[in-house]
Structures are given as structure tokens and as C-alpha cells.
Amino acid sequence: MEINTHNAEILLSAANKSHYPQDDIPEIALAGRSNVGKSSFINTMLNRKNLARTSGKPGKTQLLNFFNIDDKLRFVDVPGYGYAKVSKTERAKWGRMIEEYLTSRENLRAVVSLVDLRHEPSADDVQMYEFLKYYEIPVILVATKADKIPRGKWNKHESAIKKKLNFDQADTFILFSSVDKTGLDASWDAILEKVNK
């Protein structure tokens, strides 16, 4: 499948099933804790500066944001998790919204699960990964902010992340940087492989 990534736009924001686009265009969901670099990942992948708004206020994305890419693929930006200043009620609401999408959406082909390469995965990161494995949803694990760590230490950080998550070798692991575009091609290859299956 040839995709013109320049032909991308935000399509709609949805709070529940009734708002999802009604068609069979494949979707890739993007999940990760607040401030992991999800918006930067989307903007880098689509070669745009601010298609996905990078928010200085974590926890701002409270809906599922659907991005249309060339009418052939969609990215679905899932609300960032693990942000402490959001009330328990809000967190529970997000949880239900995310769970409903991930477990019932037939268009979903895989989840890009983003973690910060600099830090050991949080309890929320582990829970998200276990959730995806439990529901047998294909995972592309993307470790962001690779430019913040010397190249010589990448392997050490990668191993620590894989160990903490009990990483399944059948899943894809990609080191990524929105600053120097490390992992850009590998991410597209992994996504298109899932979409074309």
C-alpha cells in the first residue's frame, strides 16, 4: 500500500462508539503516558509541525482523536494515561473509553505503545502492555526520546524496558526520536506490515 503521508488531517474527536467513523479504513492506535511524546511522534511520522497539538499541559487530550492519512489509513490518538492531576472519576471515564475502543473496534490493526527510553516503564505502561497482550492486539513498542541518551547506552535502556514489560519477542521494538528522525522508517515499515496483513 502506497500512502501519501503529506495528505493528512485531523478527522474527528470521539468520546464513544457512536462517534467513530463508519467505514473499514484500517486504524493504528497510539497509546502512552502523558508527555511521552505522542504528538511529536504523530507530527514526525506525518512530516508536519503541529497537526497533533503538543500540549504543555499533560492530560489535555481527553478524547480519541482520529487522523485521516490519504484516505487509506488512520492514526487514533488515545488519551495519555498516568497523569496524577486528573480526578479519579476522569481517569475511570478515560479508561472505559480506551477499553471500549481497543476491545471492540474492528478497524484496529495494531497499537503503537509509546514509552520513554530514558526511564523504566511505569506501572501504567506495564498495565497497558499486559492489557494489549491479554486481548491479543498486535503491539509496536516505540521507545521515544532516543536522542536524549548516548547511542552507546541504547542497548542497556532497551533491555531494561523489555525486562520490565516482560516483552514478547513476537512484537516489534523501535527506538525513536522526533528530533533526528531515528526510527521513522522502521515505524512506517512496522505499521504498514500490520495494515497489509
Curated annotation (Swiss-Prot):
- Which keywords does this Swiss-Prot/TrEMBL entry list? Cell cycle, Cell division, GTP-binding, Magnesium, Metal-binding, Nucleotide-binding, Septation
Q: Which terms does the record give in the GO molecular function aspect?
A: GTP binding; metal ion binding
Q: Does the keyword GTP-binding apply?
A: yes
- Gene Ontology biological process terms in this record: division septum assembly
The cofactor named in the record is: Mg(2+)
**Entry-linked InterPro entries:** G_ENGB_dom, GTP-bd, GTP-bd_ribosome_bio_YsxC, P-loop_NTPase
PROSITE patterns membership: G_ENGB
The organism sits in which domain of life? Bacteria
At which positions is GTP bound? 32-39, 59-63, 77-80, 144-147, 176-178
Q: Which residues hold Mg(2+)? A: S39, T61
The record's annotation in Pfam families points to: MMR_HSR1
Q: Could you name the Gene Ontology cellular component terms for this entry?
A: cytosol
Residues of the EngB-type G domain: 24-197
Which HAMAP family does the UniProt record give?
A: GTPase_EngB
The family this protein is said to belong to: Belongs to the TRAFAC class TrmE-Era-EngA-EngB-Septin-like GTPase superfamily. EngB GTPase family.
Q: What is the purpose of this protein?
A: Necessary for normal cell division and for the maintenance of normal septation.
| Name the UniProt record assigns to this protein | Probable GTP-binding protein EngB
Q: Tell me the organism.
A: Streptococcus gordonii (strain Challis / ATCC 35105 / BCRC 15272 / CH1 / DL1 / V288)
